[in-house]
């Protein structure tokens, strides 16, 4: 059984700290922020291990100690560990770290608040001593970055100083999109141990900052990854491991990484898992539109130009299945990510009882790829009069299993205000969530409709020449953003919105098109090309997929990083695997 004691995250109340109005820099001790000159003088106490043997467990071989400092989605690693047959002991005191037989540190969120928590609670010193003694350790994502001297994120900010180097932001001038989101390949070195089964398979990354190989840290490196440049994707020295990617979100190959850490004496397989990964893959995302039907049941539905009701006398909500079951099937079918869109208000529920929260908790038990949830990420007051901020709503979604949250109407309001004033207030849900959890955790969903015009000067928005003329032969159009499920048009174009939300902290754009929704005639290539050419963050093409050819078309003709579909997968018209096989035949990199 899992230990019943409260996790460290609840003791330090870091979630409440993150919700405060003070900025990260203000909430962090001044000692965390270093000058570039002093960064190189960080004291490093790590000693080379005398033995590579695994320390025998003094309690139980089926218990893992987990350091959860209270930010982001840690439920997924918990579920992965349970899936592998392990129970979890949560860190409550520094002594729990020192007494751990094996320790996993799934760092999520931003560097500065994580170091703030570790320093305030004495965990930083305990972590360094644990690692110095060559005890079994696995850091994940931020759990790798914190081992370095410092980070430029919100800083410079001093790290644990175990590994030489500065964690810096990816260089977008190299022609890459930042954040680095998606499935990429590893270049595995010798003696990686926990990566022995990976081979040429993709693993899942989501980060904006990285550490670079150097002469000073080369002895730590067990694998690198290429994204505009070579960066450190994993380290290993003795029993100390850390990875930049998310094994708990990398499907079966990721579970094999965790399994090898937990069972270091497992015999090597005859050959690594088969695959042909060589670079960042294009993603195929399955979307589930979730709402209550007229009977009060939570169902997956699908719209026709955003209309989700059957065209019959009953006019009932289309019911295409139960969300948890469908998500599980999509995972088995090979979906690279699963996106839930909550299209019901649910405002009568207390936050912890929201139906979508329950869907996430159940889904994340057996689905080990990224989960995104959208709809309703805004301030609200429930039926009892309790007020919740958008940051609290997002925090609950993350703690329930979401890896990314998608903001729609609220982002439109924030963008309109930003364009009008030219000032970032820091008060919008987009800015607040991005500041606490990093922009890689925030997706902005854009719902535009095509508006034809006779001449580019007819409107004060970005106008393009379209491939298909309008009903009166118009050769030009702009894309008007909408809110309230497409029912209300706003005085802002998709181009203007995309540029604004990137400035405000969005890490990814989900680009829909009302005109193409449910039509099965392909994505709006003109729109996708316009937006993906205009921003430096990843763009997900959505609306209109009807055949595998539509996926290859959008990847070949635009700079979209991913393509999303709903209805064709729900109705089993096109299997996910068929889409991937087609993309592979077209020589488009995909995860198989």
Curated annotation (Swiss-Prot):
Specify the superkingdom. Eukaryota
Q: Know the name of this protein?
A: Imidazole glycerol phosphate synthase hisHF, chloroplastic
Q: In its UniProt record, which GO terms are filed under biological process?
A: L-histidine biosynthetic process
Family recorded in the similarity comment:
In the C-terminal section; belongs to the HisA/HisF family.
Active site, UniProt feature: 141 (for gatase activity), 246 (for gatase activity), 248 (for gatase activity), 289, 447
Q: Which gene encodes it?
A: HISN4
Q: Name the Enzyme Commission number(s) assigned to this protein.
A: 4.3.2.10, 3.5.1.2
Region annotated Cyclase, chain positions: 280-592
Cellular localization per UniProt: Plastid, Chloroplast
Q: Which UniProt keywords apply?
A: Amino-acid biosynthesis, Chloroplast, Glutamine amidotransferase, Histidine biosynthesis, Hydrolase, Lyase, Multifunctional enzyme, Plastid, Transit peptide
Q: Which GO terms describe its cellular component?
A: chloroplast; chloroplast stroma; plastid
Q: Where is the transit peptide?
A: 1-55
* Disulfide links within the chain: none
Q: Which HAMAP family match?
A: HisH (MF_00278)
Q: What is the catalytic activity of this protein?
A: 5-[(5-phospho-1-deoxy-D-ribulos-1-ylimino)methylamino]-1-(5-phospho-beta-D-ribosyl)imidazole-4-carboxamide + L-glutamine = D-erythro-1-(imidazol-4-yl)glycerol 3-phosphate + 5-amino-1-(5-phospho-beta-D-ribosyl)imidazole-4-carboxamide + L-glutamate + H(+); L-glutamine + H2O = L-glutamate + NH4(+)
Q: Which Pfam families match?
A: GATase, His_biosynth
Annotated transmembrane regions? none
Record's signal peptide: none
Q: What is its main location?
A: plastid
Domain Glutamine amidotransferase type-1 stretches = 63-271
Q: Which GO terms describe its molecular function?
A: glutaminase activity; imidazoleglycerol-phosphate synthase activity; lyase activity
